[in-house]
């Protein structure tokens, strides 16, 4: 991720963006043939729940496509990421959360998702990809480790709950309420003199342990 993400006091948007120049340097040094895929987390938990911009997703996609490298998202909090894009990235204010999520995934070859975050369920997850050959390989492995490809060891009840949760989480009112709850807590902590990671992310408030001590 970009260097600015490591400065907990810097309050700027999209601190989860990948440094594309560093990524290109890494590809040139290691060789594209030695890189299985690039993983882009949306949002970035490591940096305090910071979002990734559409502009950065496009830039990463263009670079990796040039080298024949796949891009997979850690999409566990992708709907939160879409909310931040709508709120902060020029040109997206009038777009629906759902349409922004769809555009985000148009720049990826696949993604992993935990059901316990933006899907609003207590269990499960899933893996998606647009490469049929890769899908067939994954399909063979899931039988060995999890269950049949159609359910992966999950109960039908949980898969249905996950589908409903995804639909409900894209409602702007819900996501706005959730993000602003985190901001409310963060602002209260700041007012009390507690150092936190800024800007406040979508799902949690992270303490700045170095300054806190």
Language model features by range: what are they?
Residues 204:
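Short glycine-rich, basic-tinged beta-strand/loop micro-motifs
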Residues 1-196, 207, 213:
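Conserved PLP-enzyme active-site core in the AAT-like
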Residues 200:
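Cationic-aromatic interfacial patches
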């Amino acid at each position: 991720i970009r260097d600015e993400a490591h400065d907990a006091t810097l309050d700027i948007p999209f601190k989860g963006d990948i440094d594309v120049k560093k990524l290109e340097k890494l590809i040139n040094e290691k060789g594209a043939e030695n890189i299985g895929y690039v993983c882009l987390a949306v949002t970035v938990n490591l940096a305090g729940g910071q979002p990734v911009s559409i502009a950065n997703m496009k830039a990463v996609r263009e670079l990796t496509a040039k080298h024949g490298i796949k891009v997979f998202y850690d999409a566990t909090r992708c709907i939160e990421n879409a909310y931040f894009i709508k709120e902060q990235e020029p040109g997206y204010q009038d777009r629906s959360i759902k349409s922004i999520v769809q555009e985000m995934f148009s720049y990826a070859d696949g993604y992993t998702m935990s059901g316990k975050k933006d899907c609003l369920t207590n269990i499960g997850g899933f893996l998606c990809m647009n490469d049929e050959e890769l899908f067939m390989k994954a399909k063979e492995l899931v039988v060995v480790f999890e269950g049949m490809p159609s359910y992966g060891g999950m109960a039908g009840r949980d898969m249905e709950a996950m589908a409903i949760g995804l639909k409900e989480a894209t409602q702007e009112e819900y996501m706005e309420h959730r993000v602003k709850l985190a901001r409310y807590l963060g602002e209260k902590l700041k007012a009390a003199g507690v150092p936190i990671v800024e800007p406040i992310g979508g799902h949690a408030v992270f303490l700045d342990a170095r300054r806190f001590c």
